[in-house]
Swiss-Prot record:
This is WD repeat-containing protein JIP5. Residues 405-496, 531-582 are annotated as: Disordered. Its main location: nucleus. Belongs to the WD repeat WDR55 family. It comes from Debaryomyces hansenii (strain ATCC 36239 / CBS 767 / BCRC 21394 / JCM 1990 / NBRC 0083 / IGC 2968). The lineage of its organism: Eukaryota, Fungi, Dikarya, Ascomycota, Saccharomycotina. Gene3D superfamilies: YVTN repeat-like/Quinoprotein amine dehydrogenase.
């Protein structure tokens, strides 16, 4: 019985898994609900289900250097073990490595000395859980303040360095339903507008410079029928315009007037959205990428249909939901500027090139069961001040290296022969042998050649269908074949390259099979003529039957001549230009 085929998502993740590793991994004993990265400094906020907020600082350069040095040492030890036969193959996968070469913090509340990461301060900021926390994005106070909200229905503004609360606002009195709660916080990038989305689909707007007054500045009622999943500012359009996601629709709202447009029902939950990196850099708010609960990312354009419906979709992981999406923010790299990061419920990170419409890189945030589920689902993504990706679930947080993939490209020749593919070595035991690798590679090359229509004409290898067409054309011109001149018989082998000689041999091999079929048809006609002659004797029929094969054999020899076929090809009589260089 054949082996059960693995899911496409698993195979794709293993094939596209990047060699980039984290520089630090922080584990949280209590569920992690929200994170935020400082826009200009290596400062990290983390809000927990207990209502605590931690403000941490990390030395990114030292962490990068430490993980790179340790990885090189482990790589050398692994190569030595492979040469001595202690291990079957060299592992190139980051997620399947038994040893971690990056810094691992087992408890975020108890960080050991010398870890190159410290907690600046921690506090019990909210009585319930901390739902959302963000840094101040205004240009004149960039990153100086933080805003947080919890299930206690209080928004608090605090200083980033000290953690001291500067002002707060109680928002429960502005709910349309007393059982409502805040799900999301977003601040305008140009105006003191602090937006909060609720579980009932409302958007409440406060003045971040005057929160102590507890006055509601704007209110958009029922932007969606269900909980607000995401709010995205549109600074290129107006400081009053925002995009919101809720349930199965996308809405374009003006916080002064209400809903401008609302999309068609997508029949799938819309979870997160972002602008592409080039649109963020060029201050454009036209192309929007939206993540779905069914494992896809859709592309929307305001200029095409006013965001009424999706234009195209990219399949990411049909086995999981895409819970978070964020632009790379790196406009210095041509590949990165067209890409966005997204995290799914299976603990995988995917980099999508939205212009190519496919996943181009995969990283594994969590491959094992977590404390709060089968896997640590990637529910939060952020980008730090130096374009490093930050991924987080409820159990752990990882800051990924921003170095390019260089380690896997520096492979030794001695190792590449025995371990060409980590995937093959993990899937079966036979893939450790060189013979099986060669056989698999040859099989793959044959399959690729079968599916590439131009491969034969470029390499000079003809398939059986082309041979049949050439011979059929030569049979239709039977008189020309029989009148082959002596000069054509005397073509020297030096006039043709070795590749063309291989073509001739293949055609000679197929010519008798085709010519036999034509001879069989002629033989039937001759037998019918012979049966009509009743006066002939059996003794006279026998030599005729013996003479016919002799004549037919001569015709076979004439048809086996490849010079006619070569001449026809050189004159392009078949429309195939294969010997233009001769």
């Amino acid at each position: 019985m054949a082996k059960k085929k693995k899911s496409n998502a698993t195979n794709a993740a293993r094939l596209l898994e990047s060699s980039i590793s984290p520089i630090v991994e922080i584990k949280y004993p209590e569920p992690l609900f929200t994170i935020a990265a400082h826009p200009t400094k290596p400062i990290l906020l983390s809000g927990l289900a207990t209502g605590h907020i931690y403000c941490s600082t990390y030395d990114a350069d030292i962490l990068e250097e430490a993980q790179s040095t340790k990885r090189e040492k482990l790589s050398l030890l692994e190569k030595e073990a492979f040469k001595t036969g202690k291990i079957a193959h060299i592992n190139r996968s980051v997620s399947q490595s038994k040893q971690k070469w990056w810094t691992v913090i087992e408890d975020n509340a108890d960080i050991p000395d010398g870890s190159n990461i410290v907690n600046n301060w921690k506090t019990k900021r909210h009585k319930g859980s901390c739902r959302s926390a963000i840094f101040d994005p205004l240009e004149n106070s960039l990153g100086e303040n933080i805003y947080s909200v919890g299930t206690d229905h209080i928004i608090k503004k605090a200083n980033t360095e000290t953690g001291k609360v500067l002002s707060k606002a109680t928002i429960s009195e502005h709910y349309s339903d007393k059982n409502d709660a805040i799900t999301k916080l977003v601040h305008s990038t140009s105006h003191p507008f602090l937006l909060s989305g609720t579980e009932n689909g409302d958007v409440l707007v406060y003045d971040s410079n005057n929160m102590a007054s507890n006055q509601l500045k704007f209110n958009v009622s029922k932007a969606h029928d269900d909980s607000i999943n995401h709010i995205l500012p549109m600074p290129a359009v107006s400081a009053y315009h925002y995009l919101t996601l809720g349930s199965t629709t996308l809405s374009h709202i003006d916080i002064r007037k209400g809903i401008i447009t609302q999309s068609d029902d997508q029949e799938d939950e819309l979870l997160s959205m972002c602008f592409a990196s080039d649109h963020v850099n060029d201050n454009k708010n036209d192309t929007v990428l939206v993540s779905h609960g069914e494992g896809i990312v859709t592309i929307w354009k305001n200029s095409k249909n006013r965001l009424m419906d999706q234009l195209s979709r990219i399949k990411v992981n049909k086995e999981a939901s895409i819970d978070a999406i964020i632009p790379t923010m790196n406009c210095d790299d041509g590949e990165m500027v067209d890409s966005v990061w997204c995290g799914d419920s299976e603990g995988l990170l995917h980099r999508i090139n939205y212009k190519k419409g496919k996943v181009v890189e995969t990283r594994v945030h969590s491959s094992a069961a977590g404390k709060h589920g089968p896997a640590d689902e990637v529910g939060i993504l952020d980008i730090d001040y130096d374009y490093r990706l930050i991924s987080a679930g409820m159990d752990s947080l990882k800051i990924w290296s921003n170095q390019e993939e260089t380690l896997n490209s520096d492979s030794d020749d001695s190792d590449s022969d025995d371990s060409d593919s980590d995937i093959g070595s993990n899937d079966s035991e036979d893939s450790d042998s060189d013979d099986d690798d060669v056989a698999i590679n040859n099989k793959i090359e044959d399959e690729v050649n079968d599916f590439s229509p131009d491969s034969d004409s470029e390499t000079g290898n003809d398939d059986s269908d082309e041979n049949l067409e050439d011979v059929a054309d030569s049979d239709s011109n039977e008189d020309q074949i029989e009148n082959v001149t002596d000069e054509e018989h005397q073509l020297s082998d030096t006039e043709l390259p070795t590749k063309s000689l291989q073509i001739i041999r293949k055609k000679r091999f197929n010519v008798p099979e085709i010519s036999n079929k034509t001879n069989i048809n002629k033989k039937v006609v001759d037998i019918n003529k012979l049966t009509k002659e009743q006066s002939t004797k059996k003794a006279d029929e026998e030599p005729e039957e013996t003479e016919e094969p002799d004549k037919k054999k001569q015709k076979l020899k004439a048809k086996q001549m490849s010079t006619k076929q070569i001449r026809n090809m050189q004159k392009h009589e078949h429309g195939i230009r294969r010997f233009d260089d001769l």
